[in-house]
């Protein structure tokens, strides 16, 4: 197979996005082909919306996000088969598994439990497990990740190797509202049940979030040991729980409502990691 010319694809997508008001379901030719090829490459994991650099920073391929957005203008609404009880949906994005047989699933190498939903252009790596969950388009789920029941992986989100997203976890998307960078959960993190990480925040490698921790760009993440406050990023190997901080006093009173924050209570040690490590038996 010929290696795709990514520079040419990027150029076409960028130009098309600048002229997006003129793009619709009747658009054919170079623009449609570039968008469709970009989504196929995302679906295969040959490209990804964000890539970690050697210095630890993440580079965002904005043109791939733009390709995903352009696909909504190009594709008409249509019947999407595969609903419960042989019902259907009405949408613009087909299932990743559309037309798959046992051969495709064997080759992909991950487990997809009944009722999980993965949209076309999301990549799922080998040895990942998808419980009844939702993975949105453009997302990247790396090797050995567990996406537990009712967890949601938002558009273009990046989920690292051996990450465990517990039941009901929400990882925010970045298409609406359009954020600068995707939400990222780095390798070997454990995200506790019903927690939410949104707005392009990053949870660095090896961190553990307890149940019900909510992190957005404006959330104060307080290191209890040092008093340092972080925004938008959980440092590596942090153990984080939900907490509160004193708020300003209300006018004329000596009290005020406390405000939510996330608290780093310690750094993940061997005991913590043993409690949150993956179970290889589930991935055989």
Swiss-Prot record:
The keyword Amino-acid biosynthesis applies. One of its GO terms (cellular component) is cytoplasm. The keyword Cytoplasm applies. One of its GO terms (biological process) is lysine biosynthetic process via diaminopimelate. Its EC number is 2.3.1.117. It holds the Pfam family Hexapep_2. This is 2,3,4,5-tetrahydropyridine-2,6-dicarboxylate N-succinyltransferase.
